[in-house]
Amino acid sequence: MEVKAIVKDTGYSALKVRLCVDLVRGKKVSEAITLLRFMTSPTAKVVSKVIKSAAANAENNFQMNPADLKISQIYADEARMLKRMRPQARGRVSPILKRSSHITVVVAD
């Protein structure tokens, strides 16, 4: 049985989130949370919350044992970009792309 949790429009780019996501793919939920707790990246806190949410969904909705859960799929997709302009010399502008991402976690027993 697979249980999913999704967080949308995080304030971090998908590239930065994927650094944390790639470390915990395929690990047990408890092991992944302890691994993320000691990471210095601010994205680790968001990824940890999504993993905890998926584990809670499995426990409350499907009566699965949280100790047996393993992260079967985890990925970060690109979300919408906020486009801003920064003034430059000679009346020109250069774009600033504020990127965000969607994080999806699927746990299975």
From Swiss-Prot:
Lineage: superkingdom: Bacteria
An annotated GO BP: translation
Alphabetic keyword roster: Ribonucleoprotein, Ribosomal protein, RNA-binding, rRNA-binding
GO cellular component: cytosolic large ribosomal subunit
Residue stretches spanning the membrane: none
GO MF terms, alphabetically ordered: rRNA binding; structural constituent of ribosome
Family indicated by similarity: Belongs to the universal ribosomal protein uL22 family.
Quaternary structure (record): Part of the 50S ribosomal subunit.
Function description: This protein binds specifically to 23S rRNA; its binding is stimulated by other ribosomal proteins, e.g. L4, L17, and L20. It is important during the early stages of 50S assembly. It makes multiple contacts with different domains of the 23S rRNA in the assembled 50S subunit and ribosome.
Protein name listed in UniProt: Large ribosomal subunit protein uL22
Phylogenetic classification of the source organism: Bacteria, Bacillati, Chloroflexota, Dehalococcoidia, Dehalococcoidales
